[in-house]
Amino acid sequence: MSELPSLFNPKSQIQNPKWLSAARWLFGPGEPGYLWPRWLFLRALGFIFFTAFYSLVFQIRGLIGPQGILPASEYLQAVGQQLGARRLWYAPTLLWLASGDRALQLLCWAGLMAAVLLMLNLWPRAALVVCVTLFLSFVCAARDFSDYQSDGMLLEAGFLSCFFAPPGLRPGLGENHPPSRASLFMLRWECFRIYFESGLVKLLSGDPQWRHLTAMDHYYENGPLPDWIGWYVQQLPHRFHAAAALLTLVMELGLVWMFFLRRPLRILLFFLVTPFQIAIILTANLGFLNYLVLVLGILLLDDRCLPRMFPPLKASLEAGNSKMETGNWKLENGNPAIAPRGSAAETGPRNGQSGLWARLSPVTRHSSLVFSGLFLSWIFYNTTVLLLLYLFRSLPLPLAPVVALEPFRISNQYGLFAVMTTARYEIEFQGTRDGQNWLAYPFRYKPQDPRQPPRIHAPYQPRFDWDLWFASLGAWRQYSWVVNTEVLLLRNDSSVLSLFAGNPFPGEPPTAVRAVVWQYWFTDLRTKREEGLWWRRELRGLYAPTFERDAQGNIGVHEKPAP
């Protein structure tokens, strides 16, 4: 067998260039000082993936199924016709293989199982690869229903965690594979960017509400899906809301720089951002977004402080590790010692293969360095460029690497609540059989009945209800899926009806369906106490064209909204 190149030859490691030593330091196993934060972070990330797939189980047929609002099959067919072989890069989804109802359910349930494995610390690295691949498959095919910043956040965090997680079936804390410095930094970098870029867009948007500290005065009322805690917080005086707006700007633009400072300041930052995120979780239904940002904050901690904060966690994990390690032995200086599963002592050369193993092991290690170095550096470049473009739009930077990775949603630009909405509008679908009496289709999560309190749903992500909030802020021509929904309701389509809380026409379908828009306001404490109303509302008129079905089953436009 010919001699391996010097880069992969163990006999010539002393001749390796300095860049390889630097690559090992940056992308290879780091110092074992963040084993506990990694362990807890990955379990929590598994929970977030679980909630993401769990919410899709009940929605995916109605959203992108063959009879759904935006069928994935039709979209992929159009992409394939336009891009040919390039479609696999610009739409990286497994739904190219099949996109029927069964395939969509299989995607969701496989994602759920992979998320459970990640929560149980079984094959964490492989489980992450499956979670990211399957969630990306949905995101690439769902169009309007996956155009959320939180989806990009989860894909970026999941992909980076593939390099952060320890290998093996049951790695425990992964003492033999501490996280690389680069992967830890990149996850912290993502968390920093979520905060800092959100602060930047608030300033750069020119929104007077942030400038005058009035942005939070109606934030709880006008968000995508308010909850009852936010209703009570809304009743507090303006001074409280002005202080909350100022705190948000100080946190996002100033305090988050502590991510890059010394250990005591990073730990202090953890105790600042954690209650900040918990407060958002309690007062707004933003899906899994703030849960993910909260979980990323765990990486501000280290092994010296985290076990002290969660003593039961330490005891249970140590007990589990002692059981897992029983029976795995190696020899050290002629004496037996415990060898962790997946270590070289357990999987190393045996049965006369030591020569081949010794030659291939460096190849594997260096290939891993090259792979992780390439992608982590690529993502860092892209995200740095996107951040700089917020500040210097005409900066002449190469954008080809940014564009190339864009379909994978793993190097993103963030910016939450740049401009605060000043009013709340709600789209409501109504049907009729006689053209006179219109019955509303009840929603599962959106505000509708003024007497019903706004509930807490997060981290569940009701994508249909969320997107209706976005649609209410624009014209119906920008949101063709609203019209698609009307047409499908005229047919009593079961896939779309599953997105609603009920069907006012359980037998024969309606002869006409329309989408109207209401304006909603929170009531005050007195009105709620005396009348039991959480909301007051006023009808503003048609949102989209009214569709009707004639006796032959033909569907046409009956009435259009005023321009």
Please place each PLM-identified region on the residue numbering.
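Short intrinsically disordered, low-complexity coil segments enriched in acidic
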Residues: 1-3, 434
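Cationic, low-complexity basic patches in intrinsically disordered or flexible, solvent-exposed regions
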Residues: 4, 12, 331, 354
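Intrinsically disordered, low-complexity repeat regions of secreted/extracellular protein precursors
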Residues: 13, 320-336
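Alpha-helical membrane-anchoring segments
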Residues: 17-321, 333, 346, 351, ...
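Intrinsic disorder/low-complexity segments
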Residues: 329, 340-344, 350
